[in-house]
Amino acid sequence: EKLWTPAEARETLADLFPAVDVLFAAERDARTVLGFDGDAEAMASGLAAEFDFETVVITRGEKGALARHGGTTTEQGTFPADTVDPLGSGDAFASGFLAERLDGASIDEALAYGAATAALKRTIEGDMARVSADEVRAIVEDGGGVDIER
């Protein structure tokens, strides 16, 4: 709302959507900016159907994320972490997800790597996730059984 109204944002974004394969949206933005109601699964399904996205990922903060891909919805919880600064966690999630998908991972695996990258980011001051692939992999392989501390 600082730069434009939700209606203006939706109109501008809708013009760009034909070039989008993978859409990431925070649950609140899918509701307020894109105008989709219901739970995250309904939003993801609706967005995928209306705009013909290959994949829609809805992030839900502490409730994790879900992805709609190929007519299937997959959910991922969060990994526990001592939060120092949440700023940039959504971007970190997207980067972890995309890195894995580009490397040939399944949607399930990509969601886990996105969640692990976001968890690691929350342990870092500032808005940039300065983490390694090995750190992310260790969180995923551990299954989130250990609180992440730095």
Model-derived segments and their meaning:
Residues 1-46, 63-64:
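Conserved beta-alpha-beta core of the PfkB/ribokinase-like small-molecule kinase fold
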Residues 36-150:
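Conserved phosphate-binding/catalytic region of the ribokinase-like
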